[in-house]
UniProtKB/Swiss-Prot annotation:
Organism annotation: Prochlorococcus marinus (strain MIT 9211)
Protein name per Swiss-Prot or TrEMBL: Large ribosomal subunit protein bL9
Keyword Ribosomal protein carried by entry: yes
Pfam families linked: Ribosomal_L9_C, Ribosomal_L9_N
SUPFAM superfamilies from the UniProt entry: L9 N-domain-like, Ribosomal protein L9 C-domain
Keyword Ribosomal protein: yes
Length: 152
């Protein structure tokens, strides 16, 4: 049986690991795929030092993103309520529904900060009223806002 080779991954590879992980692979896989395609590097002290430096930078970056998300969550709570105007029938039922795009637009108008509509979790909204909406700002930070749907 052939000896396995240790490599440091330069990018996430689904079946192996994440960027910066030290993995053991078959020599042929390393020689024929990972090394020629630039997806990994052989383990050396210099490479390990680079990996540690990159991990420290990544950690700082993640902390900054989390702080930014927490600050935005506080701003959303300070505003309190966001209003979306929709056309309503005689019985109070909306023509159509309130989408995450509508909510993202209302948040952008109030905060002047762009938000990805895919991070917004909207309950079924088919009538005027007040609703709770979840927004995932960061993988560790979720904000809950009050949404008011009114007719125009």
């Amino acid at each position: 049986m052939a000896k396995r080779v240790q490599l440091v991954l330069k990018e996430d590879i689904l079946s192996l690991g994440k960027d910066g992980d030290v993995v053991e692979v078959a020599p042929g896989y390393a020689r024929n795929f990972l090394l020629p395609h630039g997806k990994a590097l052989p383990v050396t002290p210099a490479v390990m030092k680079q990996v540690e430096h990159r991990r420290a930078k990544q950690k700082e970056h993640e902390a900054a993103l989390k702080d930014e998300a927490l600050a935005f969550e506080t701003a959303l709570k300070t505003i309190g309520r966001f209003t979306v105007k929709k056309q309503v029938g005689d019985d109070g039922v909306l023509f159509g529904t309130v989408t995450n795009g509508d909510i993202a637009e209302a948040i952008e108008k109030a905060t002047e900060k762009e938000i990805d509509r895919r991070t917004i979790s909207v309950p079924e909204v088919h009538a005027i009223g007040q609703y709770k909406v979840q927004i995932k700002l960061h993988h560790e930070v979720t904000a809950e806002i009050n949404l008011e749907v009114v007719s125009y």
